[in-house]
């Protein structure tokens, strides 16, 4: 089932490398005790820079957990709103999409992933990401930690193990690994979660053209696969 809101998106949006973060609004005042940092992330599950950004965000959180508590919410974005549900060869798809830039881009991603201790895998299929976003929404109903951990499982599978992001078995198994209950039943009905994904797309992602895109405590907004220190600076600025 196609999302109505996707008709307003260009066929291909942008998966972004890092750029310098800008403070977009005044920081929230300090509160007694540990400050809660709320992070909203717009991403697509086939965007490698979204995974890079997540890993760097995790590093920043680990380095800051003695100062802050964190709540992370993931929201949908569609790099290719017309991608086929049945899946197509990943390498061939990106070779066609990027043309002469493909080889250089893949070399760059391989280098970046190795810097994270991972091997970038271009095998397998790519395609429509709606079911993965439906599942991420469903996971969020069972807790932000489970949702965050699910995003990790999906990214590990798709980017390093050649798993297809639209494969039902892979989605359900990823949900099982992070303790999400009822995933198979939820995904069985193709209408489940579509309305909510549409609403989140409109609320969090309709104004952006590339991902990953972060909003910290509703104040600081930046995009791209940022290094950990960018996140840490944003946490500190918001606390002052």
What annotation goes with each model-predicted range?
Residues 34-48, 53-54, 72:
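Short active-site neighborhood of thiol/selenol oxidoreductases, capturing the structured segment around
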Residues 55-158:
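Structural alpha/beta surface segment adjacent to cysteine/selenocysteine redox centers
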Residues 1-7:
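N-terminal chloroplast transit peptides
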Residues 23-37, 200-203:
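A short beta-strand-turn-helix
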Residues 46-49, 98-102, 193, 227:
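Residue-level preference for long, well-ordered alpha-helices that form the structural scaffold
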Residues 13-14, 20, 39-43, 54-66, ...:
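C-terminal cap of thioredoxin/glutaredoxin-like
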């Amino acid at each position: 089932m196609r999302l109505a809101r996707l008709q307003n998106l260009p066929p291909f949006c942008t998966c972004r490398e890092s750029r310098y973060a800008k403070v977009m609004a005044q920081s929230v005042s300090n509160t007694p005790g540990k400050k809660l940092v709320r992070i909203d992330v717009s991403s697509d599950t086939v965007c490698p820079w979204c995974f890079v950004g997540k890993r760097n965000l995790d590093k920043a959180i680990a380095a800051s957990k003695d100062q802050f508590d964190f709540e992370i919410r993931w929201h949908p974005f569609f790099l290719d709103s017309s991608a086929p549900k049945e899946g197509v060869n990943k390498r061939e798809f990106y070779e066609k999409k990027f043309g002469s830039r493909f080889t250089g881009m893949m070399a760059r991603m391989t280098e970046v992933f190795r810097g994270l201790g991972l091997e970038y895998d271009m095998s397998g299929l790519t395609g429509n990401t709606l079911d993965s976003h439906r599942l991420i929404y469903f996971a969020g109903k069972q807790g932000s930690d489970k949702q965050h951990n699910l995003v990790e499982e999906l990214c590990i599978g798709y980017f390093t193990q050649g798993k297809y992001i639209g494969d039902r078995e892979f989605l359900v198994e990823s949900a099982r690994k992070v303790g999400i209950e009822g995933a198979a039943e939820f995904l069985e009905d193709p209408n489940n979660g579509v309305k909510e994904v549409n609403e989140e797309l409109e609320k969090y992602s309709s104004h952006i053209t590339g991902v990953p895109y972060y909003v910290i405590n509703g104040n600081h907004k930046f995009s791209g696969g940022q290094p950990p220190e960018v996140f840490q600076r944003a946490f500190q600025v918001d606390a002052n």
